[in-house]
C-alpha cells in the first residue's frame, strides 16, 4: 500500500454544511481522510470533527477537533471533547489556510496520533486522546465550502515488513525480533536487481521527536561510491543531496521549494530512478530531482540508511 490520494473511496461531492456523515469503515492506522474545499471571504472559522456518534444532546464525544480560525493572524486549534468537556487546546499558529483560497486537508490516522497535511505540506500532529477505533462519524461545521470528502482505508501502514520485494539485508542482526515495530539502524541491504531507469526504492519511517538529521544512501557496493546521498537536516531544515565518488564528496545541492520533514512525523520517501536523474517524493508530493553524477547505474546495488528515525519498511521494485 502506497500513500496515494488518487484511489480514494466513498467520495462525497459538494456536501451541504453543516455535514454529519457516517465513516464507512474503521479508522485503522494508515487510513487517510481527504477533504478538498474553499474558504469563503467572510469566514471566521470552520471545523472538522472526528466523532464517536452524532448525538446532539448529550453532545457526542469528539476524538479530534480540527478548527482553523481566521481572526487576526489566524491559527488552528485542536482539541478533544469527552463527556461534553473540552480538554487542553493545542494551537498551531503557522496556518496554511487563507480566506478566498482553496485547500486540501489530508488527515492520516497513525497508531498513536493523527498527522495532518494541508496543500501537500505537513501541518501538525495530534496525539490520540480517544482510541481511533471509537470514531465512526465525520462532522464539518462553520463557514466553509467543501467540494469533496474521500477516504483511503488501509491497515498495513506502520506494520513492519523488514525487507520485502527485491531486497536482501546485508547485516542479518538488523531483522527485528517479532513484536519489534522497526528495523535496526544502521540499515544496509543489497538490491536484488540493481538500479536502472524505472527502478524504485521506497523508505517508510517515522522521524524521531528530537531528530537532527538522517540519511538514505544508494551505493555501488564494489567501489563504495555513493551515487545518491539524501540527507534531510531537521535542525536547519535543509534537504542536502550529494555524491561521494572516487573518495571525495562533490558539491552539495540544497534548493527545495519546501522542506518536507518534521519531528515526529510518519513519512514515505519514494526514490525513482530515471534515465538522467533520480526523482524523490515525500508523502506523495514531489520534492526534488538529482542529476546522475555516477553514470554506471547498473552498479548501484546497495541501500544504506541511518540517523534519527524509526525505520519501518524498505522496499524496492
Swiss-Prot record:
Binding site for a beta-D-galactoside: 249-255
Zinc as UniProt keyword: no
Binding residues for a carbohydrate: 69, 79, 89
Localization: Cytoplasmic vesicle; Cytoplasm, Cytosol
GO BP terms, alphabetized: cellular response to virus; lymphatic endothelial cell migration; plasma cell differentiation; T cell costimulation; xenophagy
Domain of life per record: Eukaryota
InterPro entries hit by this protein: ConA-like_dom_sf, Galectin-like, Galectin_CRD
Main location, first listed in the record: cytoplasm
Entry's Gene Ontology molecular function annotations: carbohydrate binding; integrin binding
Site (Critical for binding to sialylated and sulfated oligosaccharides) residue list: 59
GO cellular component: cytoplasm; cytoplasmic vesicle; cytosol; extracellular space; membrane
Residue span, Galectin domain: 19-152, 187-317
Subunit and partners: Homodimer. Interacts with CALCOCO2/NDP52. Interacts with PDPN; the interaction is glycosylation-dependent; may participate in connection of the lymphatic endothelium to the surrounding extracellular matrix.
Domain-level remarks: Contains two homologous but distinct carbohydrate-binding domains.
Chain's role: Beta-galactoside-binding lectin that acts as a sensor of membrane damage caused by infection and restricts the proliferation of infecting pathogens by targeting them for autophagy. Detects membrane rupture by binding beta-galactoside ligands located on the lumenal side of the endosome membrane; these ligands becoming exposed to the cytoplasm following rupture. Restricts infection by initiating autophagy via interaction with CALCOCO2/NDP52. Required to restrict infection of bacterial invasion such as S.typhimurium. Also required to restrict infection of Picornaviridae viruses.
Protein name per UniProt: Galectin-8
Protein source organism: Homo sapiens (Human)
